[in-house]
Curated annotation (Swiss-Prot):
Keyword Iron assigned: yes
Protein family: Belongs to the homogentisate dioxygenase family.
Keyword line: Dioxygenase, Iron, Metal-binding, Oxidoreductase, Phenylalanine catabolism, Tyrosine catabolism
Residues that hold homogentisate according to the record: 345, 366
Gene3D superfamilies per the UniProt record, alphabetical: Jelly Rolls
Annotated metabolic or biological route of this protein: Amino-acid degradation; L-phenylalanine degradation; acetoacetate and fumarate from L-phenylalanine: step 4/6
GO cellular component: cytoplasm
Protein name: Homogentisate 1,2-dioxygenase
Residues annotated as binding Fe cation: 330, 336, 366
Single annotated GO MF: homogentisate 1,2-dioxygenase activity
Entry annotation: catalytic residues: 287
NCBIfam families named in the record: hmgA
Cofactor: Fe cation
Organism: Xanthomonas oryzae pv. oryzae (strain PXO99A)
Amino acid sequence: MHNPQHYMTGFGNEFATEAVAGSLPVGQNSPQRVAHGLYAEQLSGTAFTAPRGENRRSWLYRIRPAAVHGRFSLIEQSRLHNDFGGGPVPPDQMRWSPLPLPATPTDFVDGLYTMAGNGSPEAMTGVAVHLYAANASMHGRFFYNADGELLLVPQLGRLRVCTELGVLELEPQQIGVIPRGVRFRVELLDSAARGYVCENFGGLLRLPDLGPIGANGLANPRDFETPRAAFEQRDGAFELVAKFQGHLWRADIDHSPLDVVAWHGNYAPYRYDLRRFNTIGSISFDHPDPSIFTVLTSPSDTHGTANMDFAIFPPRWLVAQHTFRPPWFHRNVASEFMGLVHGVYDAKAEGFAPGGASLHNCMSGHGPDAATFDKASQADLTRPDVIAETMAFMFETRAVLRPTQQALSAAHRQADYQQCWSGLRAAFQHPPAKNTTSVLR
């Protein structure tokens, strides 16, 4: 699966790659005649005038420009959209079992299923959270998203994502990011695939600042991989599908748009193996805030507050003394959508299965279930807790995640989720009255 020669390493680097020698111009971007009869095309991911450290763009040298295709027409469908509803959002904690695998041939695009979201692509803020379940590769069709960049989190099955700028191979416990506007095709390397997608309408994903952690730790830049140039030259009757302003559109295209022979720049797909995350934790007491598990962050216009954080809860050792070691009970001004790629999440002993999901919106109380609380409260703290064979994650957003109607009414929603806390009984033992200073009456 890991083929280093197909990838270039580093996060946000200025890359240059060509599949045919001599295709990249030297010393300029747009020569009068590009080598080999190619076309020069710039793909901009930020404003031209964005600060240099945040500016993202790539120059593509391709067989045909991206403008060559037929007229778009609307695709009537109801599973993938930005309709997060104008009605009341229930403050309930919510949990879903895994999205069922399809019974009929379904590719990646047709298998996308919108769960929740906030903001909008036209405002360039917020996110949408989707699931996907597929059992077929994309044949004769290509997809791009004009609304946001896509963070793919496979849970079941390997994917081969063929993009304009090269090929990403993904397996569970890896993630892939497809920039806004990049065209791609998803091929299944196994009989079925399922996973999660965060569609980021806001600021481009980046590595979080490390502060006092120092120069190293969490997700290290060298572990991110960007594909080398790869192209195909195919003519035929194909379909180009676009997500634009919350709707799917289709156009006829008489060639494969994956025809970029060479490119240079810093706006490109990339992948990261979550097993390489350098986990930080307490070696004295207490459980630190979960921000220490942040892999990538999308900034907002409020300093210190993210549009979206992507955090993981990977294998780790818990050694804190005099401490309740699992994640504590919590009410959060942010909203948390969680998924499980592999194993068991250490705050939920039962009910949260790989492929499942939970949503704890702003100020909705959540935390370990009764079984986990009882076990951790009696644990022998002279021994470390080795949390192994797990990979949970969270999309955390500053704005409330509004669940879609299909998510609220889904057959795989767990109607009894709140019961996981029903066993948490009052154990308070009232001290003598002389030790009580104030009691509400």
